[in-house]
């Protein structure tokens, strides 16, 4: 089922929501709504709350542009609601969204597709705080959040295991830390667009991602041709392995000292940041597609049964 054939379809842009990434989603949603209006679409902005079903029925959009980030908006929940209401929507469907959001399950899919991932395990927070569950350096993070929310890096020089914030879940992912460069590739439809080298003063955390001057993006990344092509290949294969649709962004770490063997896939984001200076729109722009054109493409690509 595709979107309405109306020449000026009505688009509901979902944003905000209750997740830890609410503020980022509000920025993405407002930028996308403005861009879609500029492309001639009729737009209604919806801050997703417990009354979302009623508000969707009342606004009666032809298509939903999903600009939600994090849990509930990116993990298959809102996608299931939209399938039930039979409203065409952007980006990935229920299964791909749920799979990509679960870092452990997505790693199983990557391994099955022959994609390289860092060693990892799930562990109880009590065990993580009691002793090193992996030889440092390693990373501790929620297995079902994005935007580097709740991420801890335990260095080789650490005197002991980390003391975790009390609001983190009881089960967390512990992952081998891969030194080196942070790289990212966007997939649009069936094409991997480019590779961005993300340069920061330290870890690419929430602050570096969303604060002005927190990071610098080099596009195209200055990489050996083999590594550049591997990023494109791995991102497209990850997109397909998870069953993604529309737009996705896959992030990597590359340890230059190990050559091609040092490139590891971190995760695939089915709802990447959507402001004109976000990674995915930057790569689309480098491919000749403006931010407005990217948003319009996503609306035109929308469907149910994704």
From Swiss-Prot:
Subcellular location: Cytoplasm
Gene3D superfamilies: 3.40.50.20, ATP-grasp fold, A domain (3.30.1490.20), ATP-grasp fold, B domain (3.30.470.20)
ATP-grasp domain span: 107-300
Entry annotated with the keyword Metal-binding: yes
Key words of the record: ATP-binding, Cell shape, Cell wall biogenesis/degradation, Cytoplasm, Ligase, Magnesium, Manganese, Metal-binding, Nucleotide-binding, Peptidoglycan synthesis
Residues that hold Mg(2+) 2 according to the record: 267, 269
Cellular component aspect of the GO annotation: cytoplasm
NCBIfam families xref list: D_ala_D_alaTIGR, PRK01372.1
Family listed: Belongs to the D-alanine--D-alanine ligase family.
PANTHER family linked: D-ALANINE--D-ALANINE LIGASE, D-ALANINE--D-ALANINE LIGASE B
Protein name per Swiss-Prot or TrEMBL: D-alanine--D-alanine ligase
Origin species: Ruegeria pomeroyi (strain ATCC 700808 / DSM 15171 / DSS-3)
Protein's gene: ddl
């Amino acid at each position: 089922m595709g979107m309405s054939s109306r020449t000026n379809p009505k688009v509901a842009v979902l944003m905000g929501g209750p997740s830890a990434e609410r503020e980022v989603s509000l920025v993405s949603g407002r930028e996308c709504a403005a861009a879609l209006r500029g492309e001639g679409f009729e737009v209604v902005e919806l801050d997703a709350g417990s009354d979302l079903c009623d508000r969707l029925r009342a606004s009666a959009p032809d298509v939903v542009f999903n600009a939600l980030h994090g849990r509930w908006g990116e993990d298959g929940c809102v996608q299931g609601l939209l399938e039930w209401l039979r409203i065409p929507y952007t980006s990935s469907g229920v299964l791909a969204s749920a799979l990509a959001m679960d870092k452990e399950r997505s790693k199983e899919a990557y391994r099955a597709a022959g994609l390289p991932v860092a060693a990892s395990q799930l562990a109880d927070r009590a065990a993580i705080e009691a002793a090193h569950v992996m030889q440092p350096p390693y990373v501790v993070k929620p297995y079902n959040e994005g935007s580097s929310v709740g991420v801890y890096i335990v260095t080789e020089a650490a005197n002991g295991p980390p003391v975790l914030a009390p609001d983190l879940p009881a089960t967390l992912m512990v992952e081998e830390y891969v030194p080196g460069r942070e790289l990212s590739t966007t997939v649009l439809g069936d094409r991997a667009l480019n590779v961005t080298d993300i340069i920061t003063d330290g870890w690419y955390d929430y602050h570096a991602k969303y604060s002005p001057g927190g990071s610098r993006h080099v596009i195209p990344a200055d990489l050996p041709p083999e590594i550049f092509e591997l990023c494109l290949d791995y991102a497209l294969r990850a997109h397909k392995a998870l069953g993604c649709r529309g737009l996705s962004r896959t992030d990597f770490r590359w340890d230059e000292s190990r050559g091609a063997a040092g490139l590891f896939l971190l995760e695939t984001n089915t709802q990447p940041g959507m402001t004109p200076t976000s990674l995915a729109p930057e790569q689309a722009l480098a491919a000749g597609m403006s931010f407005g054109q990217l948003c319009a493409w996503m609306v035109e690509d929308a469907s149910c049964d994704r």
